[in-house]
Design a protein with these regions (language model features):
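Active-site beta->alpha N-cap acidic-glycine motif
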Residues: 1-81, 85, 89-109, 142
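Hydrophobic alpha-helical membrane-insertion segments
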Residues: 33, 84, 122-124, 147
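Basic- and aromatic-lined ligand-binding clefts that recognize polyanionic substrates
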Residues: 103-130
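Short, flexible active-site-adjacent loop segments at beta-strand->alpha-helix junctions, enriched
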Residues: 76-78, 116-118, 138
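His/Asp/Glu-enriched short active-site or ligand-binding loop at hydrolase and phosphoryl-transfer sites
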Residues: 124-153
Length: 153
């Protein structure tokens, strides 16, 4: 990860000396209220990266996350591989997702987490040209095994 950050001059990695956590995972909305309750119980605020299609399906969950004080940021509109898209396609994809998030929360996202963690010079320059920053994970949750998420929270 640090090699990628060095290559692109900057990279946002959380936590930034604080106890911030960023969560991005595919899920329905059946556990949204449970997640909010657990995070509230521990006084934890989270940045959720959501796909625009998820916002379409579950706007009430996006609003609930936002209303509970969590950040909602973009993770693309339809989980496309940004590395294989033109600049115009990337811009259209991110814009569509961000407009959906803003319509529900009233807040324009400032961060983008590229699908599959894929990005290159082309993607970085396109995203930064939109006035946004790319954020990346530093823990791969698939490596944690089959432990239920509630046991890890």
């Amino acid at each position: 990860m640090n090699d990628l950050c060095n290559r692109y001059g900057s990279c946002v990695l959380k936590p930034l000396g604080r106890k911030d956590r960023i969560i991005a995972f595919p899920w329905g909305n059946e556990d949204t209220e449970t997640l909010i309750e657990i995070f509230d119980q521990y006084n934890v605020k989270v940045t959720f990266f959501v796909v625009g299609e998820w916002v379409d399906k579950y706007p009430e969950s996006v609003k609930a996350l936002h209303d509970a004080g969590h950040e909602v940021m973009g993770h693309s509109n339809d989980h496309a591989h940004f590395n294989s898209l033109s600049a115009d396609q990337i811009i259209a994809d991110i814009t569509a997702c961000n407009e959906k998030i803003k319509a529900v929360t009233g807040v324009s996202p400032t961060l983008v987490r590229p699908p599959y963690g894929e990005y290159d010079d082309h993607v970085v320059s396109t995203v930064r040209g939109m006035g946004l920053e790319i954020i990346q994970w530093d823990v791969e949750t698939l490596a944690t095994g089959a432990m239920p998420w509630g046991a890890r929270v």
